[in-house]
Amino acid sequence: MLRSILFYPGVILSLIISPIALIRIKYLEIRGKDKERTNAIFKITHSWAKYVMWLSGAKINVHGRENIIRDEAVLFVSNHQSYFDIPLIMSTIDVPQGFIAKKELEKWPIISMWMKYIHCVFMDRENIRKSAEAIVQGIQILKSGYSMFIFPEGTRSKGKSTASFKAGSFKLALKSKVKIIPVTINGSYKLLDANGGKIKASDVEVCIHEPIDVTKLSKEEISELHSTVRDIIVSKLPKDQQ
């Protein structure tokens, strides 16, 4: 209970004061310093995510950092356990990246502003046309040299078995010809989703797997790509969550 009392006001206060950082970002925009602007946005959002995870009491263990590609855009693909997954990933994978996120997040004040700054794309999964438009937008971002992150289950598992991955999500990598880096999240649901809205400190593991070069896959391998990536990711989960 005490952690929840500290967590929610702490996050809200950090969001309220965060627009102050826009002064530097706007200055860099005016000066046309796009690279410096991108780096500044990343540092701000990365630091905020680390603060959120610190407030949560999460003890994070990261495996496979050596598999992170830093000199080209990639598509990170992960299972989805909790509302904490986005700040968890932002705090542990230290390269600029946008997220394919559910449309509801676009309505969240301040948070949606920062999500747009890091090139997040908001997807309406219940509307086929708008979902396709979101994928096209994500492909364009990847082609521009900026990495993206997607949860192809389309919903949170909350510690239950991992749902099947939607094949359409992988068009992001196939159409932009970027590598895929599978990521396993294990235990994030214990921070919130398993506690009825209360924050509880817990151990969380993030496993970053070896990249997959989609340009070297056969047609058969491409048709099974969503299942292959899912198998890689769930291999690091407890059996009852696979």
Give the role of each language-model region.
Residues 1-30, 39-43, 60, 66-69, ...:
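Membrane-interfacial terminal anchoring regions of lipid-handling membrane enzymes
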Residues 22-34, 38-43, 54-56, 70-128:
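Catalytic core of membrane glycerolipid acyltransferases/transacylases, capturing the structured
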Residues 44-50:
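N-terminal nucleotide/polyanion-binding subdomain common to many enzyme families
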Residues 49, 120-124, 154-155:
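Short, basic, glycine/proline-bearing loop/turn elements
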Residues 50-60:
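Transmembrane alpha-helices and immediately adjacent membrane-cytoplasm interface residues
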Residues 132-242:
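Non-catalytic C-terminal accessory region of glycerolipid acyltransferases
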